[in-house]
Every structure is written in C-alpha cells, then in structure tokens.
Amino acid sequence: MAKRDYYEVLGISRDADEKEIKRAYRKLAMKYHPDRNPDDKDAETKFKEASEAYEILADSSKRAAYDQFGHAGVDGQAGGGFGGGGASFSDIFGDVFGDIFGGGGRGRTTRGADLRYTLELDLEEAVKGKTVKINIPGHKECEACDGSGAEKGSRPETCGTCQGMGQVRMQQGFFTVQQACPTCRGSGQIIKNPCKSCHGQGRVRQEKTLSVKVPPGVDTGDRIRLSGEGEMGVDGGPPGDLYVQVAVREHSIFTRDGRNLYCEVPISIVDATLGGELEVPTLDGRVKLKIPPETQTGKLFRLRNKGVSPVRGGPAGDLLCRVIVETPVNLTKRQKELLEEFQQTLDGNNGTHHAPKKTSWFEGVKNFFDEMKF
C-alpha cells in the first residue's frame, strides 16, 4: 500500500511553517496516542503515521529531500517518530511543545538555524558546472566574552528558578510535563551583566566566504546542501545547514525544458524553398544544419545529444531547432517586380500544386461557410 503524502497526513499545506507543523502533529498525537486508545490498532496506526510525517517535516534537511523527491528521497530516514510510537505524553510535550515558554524542550543546546541562498547562474554555467564563491551573513563566537555572553570580569550565574537544570516540571491534568525554564529559557544560567559587544548573545555577526561546487546539469529549483554552514548553534549546539538554491538566468538564444534545449533559427525564403546548409550554435560550438527543399516555417530539426546531461547521470538531451522562414523586407522596386513575375508563374492551373496547404485551407473555409449558410 502506497504511503500517504506527509502534508496530507498532518492536514497542512506544503508551505506550512514550523509552528503549523507542530500544532497539527500535537492535535493528532493527542487524539490517537496509544495511552489514550489502548488496544485500538487503527488509532495506533494513525499515531505512527502522524509521528513519521512529523519526523520528516520537522527536520529541514529531510523536508527538503521529501519536497524534491517525495518518499523516495527519505526512505529509511523516518523511524516512526518518537521511538516508533512508544513515546509517552511527557516525551511528546518535551520534544515537540517545549517552546510554550520560549525555550527548547529537553536539550540545553540548540541547533543553529538553516540558511538559504539563491545562486543565479548563466545557462552555460548550469549545464557545464563550476565552482563559485559566495558571501553569506553568519555569526562567530564573541571574542570579547569568549562566547559566555557575560561582560569581562563577570560570568553567568546559575538560574534560581530551575537550579541550573534548564527545565521545570508543570502539572497538566493527570500528567507531569517537563518544560524549558521560563526564566533562563532552558540555558540553566542567568546573565546579569551582559557583554556590550554581543549584548549577552555570546556571538557576533560575521560574513563568511564559501566555495560552492555546482554539479553539471543543474536547473532552476535545484538545491545544493552545505552541511554545517548555516547559523552557529546556541550553547554548544551543532550548526545548521546552508541550502543554495539555483536560479538559471534566461538565455538570449536557448530555452531549456529538462534535458532538451530549444532555439529558433531564421532562414531565407530561398533556403526554405531550394534547401541549403547553415551553421547553428550549440553549447559545444557550431554545427552544420541541412535544410531540405520545401521546408515550411515551424519545422523542428533535432540534433541528437546536443542538449543537457542530467545532474544525476544519464544520456544527454537533444537540441531542437525550429526554423522561421523570414519574409523579405525593404525590397527595391525591381525585387518586387521579380516577385510579382514569380507569382504569375505559380498562378493558373498548377497553382494548387505549388501551395497545397493554402489550397486546402481555402477549401476548408469555403466548406465552412457553405455549411453555415451565410
């Protein structure tokens, strides 16, 4: 049986934020938790399904993989959520809803936030790949206070509310729930004399330069993950990740559709009529394109393997050239006379032979009006 869409399971939209995801999961967890539905297999299944969906969507990197590749992108990464459905209410409230007082649930450390950066590339760069340097805003440990957040000569003090534990217990009905301390916001410490350089944060802003290796074949919407290059963690927590989102600029000649490239090639009325040969551009250089006689405007010519090689491997696409027969402009009097003479040679008994589409079109129009009886 195919898995349901995780967003559908939680009943949220695909652009839901972290709070909406938590709120939706809390509602389902309270409704279907095994502690409240003993011996109810259907409720247990729904609880596990909701827990699995929450585990993926609450993790930014797993969510990004799921958004791009669906269930195939996260197979094996979902553990069923909170130990496969065996977690207690206290675990759920501590892990998911511990921010009621503005802090984390059980951990004293906080993972750094993920960052996103839009990288604009030319089509040639996206197709061939390259290494680019980007500058992103970030943080580093404050040197003035060595990351403590306290002014030199002072230090953080143990929080009197939680006695340095960073957590307090509160009663909710029949359950005792462990929450982040509202006084110290889960840190276990109080800074009475904050550092003037970092305002008690223990870190200051610093721009950093990173090298991003862009693989060949990327397209608009593709994302490159740089693990550990996001915001620094709080209180020794791990850093977040940086997601580089690719945006390919419009090209003056080519348009892209997956692996294939398209371009328009103008040809003269003479080349279209008599045939000829011309050079067309590709991303690998110029190639010869043979135009057969009696070519009509809009005809597509396919150049095999002159498109884009997929970023995840596989054969290259094709380049499709659509010819546009140009009508001559700015003609001299003599040129117009020659065209009129040429037109006279096409008229007469053999006129339909030289313009079959035109003849069939006029016949179709005539039949249309005859049927409508105008």
From Swiss-Prot:
GO terms for molecular function: ATP binding; heat shock protein binding; unfolded protein binding; zinc ion binding. A zinc finger (CR-type) spans 129-207. Keywords: Chaperone, Cytoplasm, DNA replication, Metal-binding, Repeat, Stress response, Zinc, Zinc-finger. CXXCXGXG motif repeats lie at residues 142-149, 159-166, 181-188, 195-202. Zn(2+) 2 binds at C159, C162, C181, C184. CDD domains: DnaJ (cd06257), DnaJ_C (cd10747), DnaJ_zf (cd10719). One of its GO terms (cellular component) is cytoplasm. The J domain is necessary and sufficient to stimulate DnaK ATPase activity. Zinc center 1 plays an important role in the autonomous, DnaK-independent chaperone activity of DnaJ. Zinc center 2 is essential for interaction with DnaK and for DnaJ activity. This is Chaperone protein DnaJ. It comes from Marinobacter nauticus (strain ATCC 700491 / DSM 11845 / VT8) (Marinobacter aquaeolei). The gene is dnaJ.
